[in-house]
């Protein structure tokens, strides 16, 4: 715990070991419900299923869940923020980097406003930390969720980062638990924690932030995303989804049109690429079996015929320019083929 705290520039007591981000989010929402009478919780329109599920549970307990509107790039409308900064709002929970469309939220500004108004602020940073280490003490947030398997660590382990304010709310008041500062029950898995620590040590790069921007310094793969964007941005058959500027450095998503300018179903492109030894996806792996349109894409106000056509690429240090050139060549074939 101390070694992880040194990496993340936190105090050791800030670190709560969990099974991953989904459990961390569940702890935040459930403990909030245990300690406050039902009032308001604000989440964005493009949250991960883990946040949506926890929100729906609290809705059944009488809480009002307010979905913060996003623009057509998936970024929250900051003009709406002042509407939520009132005593009835007990929690604002925002996903930092969106897994389906890659857009980054201005969490530092949101957190600053929450702090000024004594509102608890939680950040889902599951997709972020593989791209660089941030300094917890510099972030304007009270709670932050991480999963080790997203940054090269083992499955089944994660972190809920806290501060003194949030721990006082999350702590179990009925019984003093011996583990995790009376916030989470159960014995810690030392092998998983050690694996997560090693994965954190292996992360290169640094994440810094201003009110509006997240900056990834010394990131080894951002050039791959930029290279592919340059290949695609002037192609009239490609519609990039999410923000180009404020985007995860290891992520690109888009809709591909055929030569008649009709959207090509994602599964056709995925299968074609798979036949050519390239793995891509159409959305969040946690909702891959869902036959309904992606909620995230519907919130971008896309035409209905495009809701099943979003393609998502994830880049890693093992990828190369040659692979992207091959992918681009095959993509051009898809335009003609489908």
Please place each PLM-identified region on the residue numbering:
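Pyridoxal 5′-phosphate
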Residues: 1-338
